């Protein structure tokens, strides 16, 4: 039987920024974690637009994106309420939705459980397990902010997709890695995706 470092759920929605979720899952699998992956229909549409994917074979896309690493990625259909992550008895260490659309955010805040993604988030709340939401929207209206505040009061971590620049990023990957690294920090997973403030930076000075 394979022993994993931990088990987490990752949700990817239709907010722009699919690369955040992809990079996160790749890093978790590389480090030996088991990842339950749920992608909304709008999330798949964003995959096609942002990754220039031409095929409709979703399994092939998942297999190609997450081929490397010692962990495991289990993909679940959005309407599969029989998935283990839909139950509080399953030992799911935590969940992150990256990026998170405002529609999904609203559904979670209202306890809608309208699909597997929302149901799993609801399980995290009722079991008082770690739930991290990475919103990717701008500007924000009052409803968005109130939903974030409501979830924050329940113990949810709201981690906006806002990259830092003190590490002097040179590429788009550097910006993506900063946000993904922050997300991994919240999940308690060690990484080397960016240089932390105060650490030596390649011959740069402030």
UniProtKB/Swiss-Prot annotation:
InterPro entries linked to this entry: Flavin_trans-like (IPR036551), Flavoprotein (IPR003382), UbiX-like (IPR004507)
Cysteine disulfide partners in this protein: none
Key word Acyltransferase present: no
Catalysed reactions listed for this entry: dimethylallyl phosphate + FMNH2 = prenylated FMNH2 + phosphate
Molecular function in Gene Ontology: carboxy-lyase activity; flavin prenyltransferase activity
Superkingdom of origin: Bacteria
Residues reported to bind dimethylallyl phosphate: 166, 182
E.C. code: 2.5.1.129
Keyword annotations of the record: Flavoprotein, FMN, Prenyltransferase, Transferase
Ligand binding (FMN): 14-16, 40, 101-104, 136
Keyword Transferase in annotation: yes
NCBIfam families, sorted: PRK06029.1, ubiX_pad
Family under the similarity heading: Belongs to the UbiX/PAD1 family.
Function: Flavin prenyltransferase that catalyzes the synthesis of the prenylated FMN cofactor (prenyl-FMN) for 4-hydroxy-3-polyprenylbenzoic acid decarboxylase UbiD. The prenyltransferase is metal-independent and links a dimethylallyl moiety from dimethylallyl monophosphate (DMAP) to the flavin N5 and C6 atoms of FMN.
Name of the protein in its database record: Flavin prenyltransferase UbiX
Organism expressing this protein natively: Halalkalibacterium halodurans (strain ATCC BAA-125 / DSM 18197 / FERM 7344 / JCM 9153 / C-125) (Bacillus halodurans)
Lineage of the organism: Bacteria, Bacillati, Bacillota, Bacilli, Bacillales
């Amino acid at each position: 039987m394979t022993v994993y470092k931990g088990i987490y759920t990752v949700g990817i929605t239709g907010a722009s920024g699919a690369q955040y979720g992809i990079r996160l899952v790749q890093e978790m699998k590389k480090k030996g974690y088991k990842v339950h992956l749920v992608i909304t229909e709008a999330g798949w549409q964003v995959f096609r637009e942002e990754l220039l994917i031409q095929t409709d074979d979703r399994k092939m896309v998942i297999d190609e994106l997450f081929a490397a690493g010692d962990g495991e990625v289990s993909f679940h259909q959005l309407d599969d309420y029989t998935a283990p992550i839909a139950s509080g008895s399953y030992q799911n260490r935590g969940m992150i939705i990256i990026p998170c659309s405002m529609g999904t955010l609203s559904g979670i805040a209202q306890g809608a459980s309208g699909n597997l993604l929302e149901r799993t988030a609801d399980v995290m709340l009722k079991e008082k397990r770690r739930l991290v939401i990475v919103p990717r929207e701008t500007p924000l209206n009052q409803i968005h902010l109130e939903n974030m505040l409501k979830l924050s009061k329940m113990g949810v971590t709201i981690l906006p997709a806002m990259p830092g620049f003190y590490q002097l990023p040179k590429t788009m990957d550097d910006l993506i890695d900063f946000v993904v690294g922050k997300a991994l920090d919240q999940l308690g997973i060690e990484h080397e995706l960016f240089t932390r403030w105060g650490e030596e930076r390649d011959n740069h000075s402030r």
